[in-house]
From Swiss-Prot:
Species of the source: Haemophilus influenzae (strain ATCC 51907 / DSM 11121 / KW20 / Rd)
The name this protein goes by in its record: Uncharacterized protein HI_0666
Source species, domain of life: Bacteria
Pfam families for the chain: Couple_hipA
InterPro entries per record: HipA_N1 (IPR017508)
Amino acid sequence: MRDLVRSGKVFLYGEFIGLLREDHRGFHFSYNPDYQGIPLSLSFPIEQSPFHSDTLFPYFASLVPEGWLKHKYALHQRIDESDMFRFLLNNGENMLGAVQIQEEKQ
């Protein structure tokens, strides 16, 4: 069992909408209670109860680079290529599109 907890603040169009967290039970996404905008995706309808998954949610996993670019990032940043959450935390502020993820320091 891991004691490690990692988390990132999720922004949509620059607005803080929720928190993505990893702990010993898996991955969790919860909306900011004050957020009243559009859902992040169809797989995350607006609701107050958190979403849970044993693995990184497919929506967030799809934001991670693939192939040679993923390999380059891993070498340059000295991270494990299989650690997709670390990729998001390291690069989430510079992703294409409307979503950004900012690592929350513990």
